[in-house]
Amino acid sequence: MDCFKFSISENELVAMPSGALWWPAQSILCVSDLHFGKSSRLARMGQSWIPPYENQDTLLRLETDLDSTSAKKIICLGDSFDDNEASQSLPLDELLWITKMQAGREWIWISGNHDPSPKNLGGSFLHYLEIGKLYFQHIASADDRFEISGHYHPKIRVIIKGQSFTRRCFLVDKNRVILPSYGTYTGGLYCNRDPLRSIMQQNAIALMTGKEIYPIPISKAN
């Protein structure tokens, strides 16, 4: 697995190809926008029908990342559930899967715009979290602080040898990191368009996910 190491406020962080962020010194794995229950919410609203397997796929990738890092703490950066009802209607096997992953580690749910209410799923529920100089919350702010967030589902499009590729990506500048969506069924916003273009500093880079991480200046995105 080819990851990408970088530093924010003298803290070494690791962007993983899956879209997870690993903080080795603190043994913290951070993921954002899992959006459990999206297919069931769309079905309830009669908007669309997509195969109801996204939870299992997302949980399997998360379990793989937890196993590979042996993380002692996990931070879910908001929109872990597609709505508040989704957190109450997970199938029993998926609830047990989450419970199994929570065993022996600290688990923190950060509130998001899709899931602002506490969950009865174990772990802690917070609106934000500060660890040292790093501030974890769902949506990036305009404050001049070192910040880890999600929400926007950033993606990047590049043209290589005449072929167009679109992938989820991390966005990184000297003050902040915006994580890609980790959930299976999620759309995204192009990193070189507003509001992301306005949020990130001019020298920001995108870390394109896939089988390995590719760093690309946002200015080079198509």
What is the meaning of each model-derived region?
Residues 1-77, 81-222:
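Extended recognition/assembly regions associated with phosphoester-bond processing machinery
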